[in-house]
Structure formats: structure tokens, C-alpha cells
Design a protein with these regions (language model features):
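Enriched for short, Lys/Arg-rich terminal
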Residues: 2, 11-24, 49, 57-65, ...
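PIN-domain endoribonuclease scaffold, especially VapC-family toxins
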Residues: 24-32
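A short, surface-exposed loop/turn module that caps and links secondary-structure elements
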Residues: 32-59
Length: 87
């Protein structure tokens, strides 16, 4: 599956690369796992509700969540920083 990043999620990814390399390693592990198993696996995957009902969330750590959407052809990453409730 193709990986796609929103403008916000790419900025988040670059921020982790510069300021939180240990968490970036965790993010990369989550991305690999999502490619293998989009709806199960590490990071406690959970479907989101309400206006984000087509998205899923995985725990990076207690503060940050990886939010993504799976389509027939790609995985779209919406954000990596904070909880999805901050959108």
C-alpha cells in the first residue's frame, strides 16, 4: 500500500525526527505494523468516532497518537502529535 502524509502529519513527522528521535523510532515501528495489519497490532489500534469515524488511532506514548485512514490503495497519515481530540 502507498503511504501518504497530510501537510500537518509530515510537519509532525519532521518535528519528531529533529526533537524526539526515540519517539520517531516508535512511530516508524507503528507505520510498519499498520502496513502489515491496518486494524490490529501494536499501539492499541482503535477506530475513531464522530467526525473522525473513518480514521484510526494508535498510541505512540501517553501524550501522542498516530491518526490514520486506510483506503483501498493507500494509508493516509493525518497527524502524529497530541491526541486526536486536539484537531
Amino acid at each position: 500500500m502507498k503511504l501518504a502524509f497530510t501537510k500537518e502529519s509530515w510537519a509532525d513527522y519532521l518535528w519528531f525526527q529533529e526533537y524526539e528521535p526515540k519517539l520517531l523510532k516508535r512511530i516508524n515501528e507503528l507505520i510498519k505494523d499498520i502496513q502489515r495489519n491496518p486494524f490490529t497490532g501494536i499501539g492499541k489500534p482503535e477506530p475513531l468516532k464522530a467526525n473522525l469515524s473513518s480514521y484510526w488511532s494508535r498510541r505512540i506514548n501517553s501524550e501522542h497518537r498516530l491518526v490514520y485512514k486506510v483506503t483501498d490503495s493507500e494509508i493516509i497519515f493525518a497527524s502524529f502529535k497530541f491526541h486526536y481530540s486536539k484537531h
